[in-house]
Amino acid sequence: MAAIEAVNAREILDSRGNPTVEVEVLLEDGTFTRAAVPSGASTGAFEAYELRDGDAGRYLGKGVQKAVAAVVDEIGPAIQDLDAADQRIIDATMIELDGTENKSRLGANALLGVSLAVAKAAADSAELPLYRYLGGPNAHTLPVPMLNVINGGSHADTNVDIQEFMLLPVGASTFSEGLRWGVETYHALKSLLKKKGLSTGLGDEGGFAPNLDSNRAALDLLMEAIDAAGFTAGKQIALGLDVASSEFYSDGAYTFEGQKVDAAHLTAYFADLVASYPLITIEDPLDEDDWAGYDHFTAELGSKVQIVGDDLFVTNPKRLADGITRGVANSILVKVNQIGTLTETLDAVSLAQRSGYTTVLSHRSGETEDTTIADLAVAVEAGQIKTGAPARSERVAKYNQLLRIEQDLGAAAVYAGRSAFPRFQA
């Protein structure tokens, strides 16, 4: 393999018009790659630290020049001449250089940009696609796309509390077919919204953001759209939710649909939804620190539905290990910028899979054209990917990359489909 010759960084814009970090890596053999870092809107309290400048006179305080300087002035010199193939050594070097528990000195956005760019460079130098370089010869499973077609919560300015309402084409035979089903249902949903006089404006992740009377009304719209597109709900296309409950939790209570309620109330509410709709996955149904609530929620619904920990686990192996020991949730959402390096991300995925937890690769609401997570989903055989609606180029870029990977794999490609959701019975 080739040693790292130079590392550069710059400030670019994400899909919400906020600055983010882009890193470029040059190897001694001439290989040149770049990676861009995403940013979230609903962020977990235990995520690795995203370093921003705090200068109110520039980008409203959201500039990332400090993180860029950290890459150029500190990280680059520290990893120069290291072998790009030594990902674990490079990531460990950056973590030690930062010296904090949450990567707050140099910024997780600085570390991640370098970590991903190095992995891409190593793959290119080895003349391998990234998914093959990271996953080896057995990486061949295409994930089920979890298409976020109705946006609420912190992703849209509406009365809908739940952040994401998703379509999951579990009955398709290939990824490309599943994506087509999702796209056709997305367009059917747009037509329905127009007929009903509802907004077809888009939220951060490309989904529609209509102002509805209730969260259940959004599920009803999805059921109607699936039927209008010519598909069978449950058998061909299932439903999923990202509740993002930490966004409406305060002082020991949840403000949900205009009422102050507790975890037991929400558990009963979602149990009713699971019984009423082909709902197969629920993400962050409770606050990230409501462990007792998760104990009850998992006991009640863990055998019936996928319970995904996002803010709960924040892609952190230590948080995940605590959850596994306690037996809460049964799936982890994997966001590379929550932990800040590729190797720590891979460690979290490995721990989850060894412990019988499913894994979901995920974008952030503030995205770029970077497609790393598409390759990563195939590399780790995640079986599921969340990267928004089939709209807005920063979302579609990931789906298009998965289409390329499917074609590259040829006859070896397998679509995860229903097998990605072992608890789902239809």
From Swiss-Prot:
A Gene Ontology molecular function term for this protein is: phosphopyruvate hydratase activity
Q: Which GO terms describe its cellular component?
A: cell surface; extracellular region; phosphopyruvate hydratase complex
**What protein family is recorded?**
Belongs to the enolase family.
- Role this protein plays: Catalyzes the reversible conversion of 2-phosphoglycerate (2-PG) into phosphoenolpyruvate (PEP). It is essential for the degradation of carbohydrates via glycolysis.
Q: Which reaction does it catalyse?
A: (2R)-2-phosphoglycerate = phosphoenolpyruvate + H2O
Q: Which PROSITE patterns match?
A: ENOLASE (PS00164)
Q: Where is the active site?
A: 205 (proton donor), 335 (proton acceptor)
Q: Its pathway? A: Carbohydrate degradation; glycolysis; pyruvate from D-glyceraldehyde 3-phosphate: step 4/5
Annotated residues that bind (2R)-2-phosphoglycerate are located at: 163, 335, 364-365, 386
Query: What's the protein name?
Result: Enolase
Question: Gene3D superfamilies this protein is in?
Answer: Enolase-like C-terminal domain, Enolase-like, N-terminal domain
Spell out the Pfam families in the cross-references: Enolase_C (PF00113), Enolase_N (PF03952)
- Which Enzyme Commission number(s) are on file for it? 4.2.1.11
Note on cofactor: Binds a second Mg(2+) ion via substrate during catalysis.
Question: Which controlled-vocabulary keywords does the entry list?
Answer: Cytoplasm, Glycolysis, Lyase, Magnesium, Metal-binding, Secreted
Q: Where in or outside the cell? A: Cytoplasm; Secreted; Cell surface
- Offer one example of a GO biological process linked to this entry: glycolytic process
Cofactors: Mg(2+)
Residues that coordinate or bind Mg(2+): 242, 283, 310
Q: Which HAMAP family match?
A: Enolase (MF_00318)
> Which InterPro entries does the annotation name?
Enolase, Enolase-like_C_sf, Enolase-like_N, Enolase_C, Enolase_CS, Enolase_N
